[in-house]
Regions:
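Catalytic machinery of carbohydrate-active enzymes
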Residues: 1-329
Length: 329
């Protein structure tokens, strides 16, 4: 959802009084609650058609001028059919799937080879706008920053924060390798902080990382809320994570990211503002698992095979960390 926020800001700069309604999942609503000028309508995909009908009753009775249909999955396409709108703007044909074209009557320009955020940003172009600058300005309450500020004393030590898990298990790196990089950073005087959600996988992964480390680490996994997470990521100097939500939240908060990419292409879905400190094994993964170079794959192809993240060695992540440390001075 963080990729959509700059588009919201672009629309608001052009039309400050524009009423905006956003159909969103409950987690996204919790994260973005307080986003000025936006009315959220939470939809739980588990609610099926009943939830879609309930959403229709919740929406204004009059038809919208424009619907920006920024999801192509079949469920999202069907859901859009419950939203009355005169102009229904969707993705270009190359990005469409699951009957997307049946639910839209306009399309964004077809530009291959661009970041997901830029593709979303182009939804303003049929409206006569351009997303000339990318601004997030996520709504972070003062209380969230106070909580984050209380988690460790600011003694001048730089902070490497590790958010070890993605929503896709095959994008996740290995606990012993996280631990090795963390120990390397700790040996250079860095504070190590672990963050994450409350799932069993995140808990077991974190426990394994801490057990494998030779240096101490601050374990905050499962202790923050979605509203506190941006404030927590903001306190880090560098966040090490696979392709994940925290990667994009950290980037939105202005924190540099050491992204771990093999299953996905950082040029398409890496930290938008700066990929200099990412490990990029996407081409190696394409050659090993698909027998093709990354250039030969359809843009956006995922390489989510077992052990694809094995292509990223400890030395790769340490080298990325040292690139950041050198630039930081």
């Amino acid at each position: 959802v963080t990729h959509v926020v700059p588009l919201v800001r672009t629309l608001q700069r052009a039309w400050p009084q524009l009423p905006l309604h956003w159909v969103i999942d409950k987690g996204g609503q919790k994260l973005l609650e307080g986003l000025d000028g936006v009315v959220f309508h939470a939809y739980d995909k588990r609610s099926g058609m009943g939830g879609m009908r309930a959403l229709r009753k919740e929406l204004p009775t009059e038809s919208f001028d424009v619907l920006l249909q920024m999801q192509v999955a079949f469920r999202a396409n069907v859901l859009s059919g419950f939203i009355p709108a005169r102009r229904r703007i969707g993705y270009d044909r190359s990005r469409s799937k699951d009957l997307h074209g049946l639910f839209v009557n306009e399309r964004i320009p077809d530009r291959p080879g661009i970041h997901v955020l830029d593709a979303i940003g182009s939804f303003c172009e049929p409206l006569g706008l351009k997303q000339a600058e990318v601004v997030w300005d996520l709504p972070v309450p003062d209380a969230a920053r106070e909580w984050a500020g209380a988690q460790w004393q600011d003694d001048g030590a730089p902070v490497l924060m590790i958010s070890p898990c993605s929503s896709h298990a095959r994008r996740n790196w290995y606990p012993d390798r996280y631990a090795a990089v963390a120990d390397h950073a700790a040996g250079k005087g860095w504070r190590i902080v672990l963050c994450g959600g409350r799932s069993d996988l995140e808990r077991s992964t974190t426990d394994a990382i801490v057990a494998a480390m030779q240096h101490p680490a601050l374990d905050l996994v499962g202790k923050d809320t979605l509203k506190q997470l941006p404030a927590l990521l903001e306190r880090a100097d560098l966040v090490m994570t696979p392709d994940s939500g925290p990667m994009h939240i950290a980037n939105a908060m202005g924190t540099k990211v050491l992204g771990l990419h093999a299953a996905s292409n950082p040029a398409r879905s890496g930290p938008y503002s700066d990929v200099r400190y990412c490990v990029d094994k996407y081409d190696a993964a394409a050659r090993k698992f698909l027998g093709k170079s990354a250039r030969e794959l359809k843009w956006g192809s995922k390489i989510e095979f077992d052990d694809v993240m094995d292509l990223i060695g400890v030395e790769d992540a340490v080298a990325a960390f040292e690139r950041y440390r050198s630039d930081r001075g």
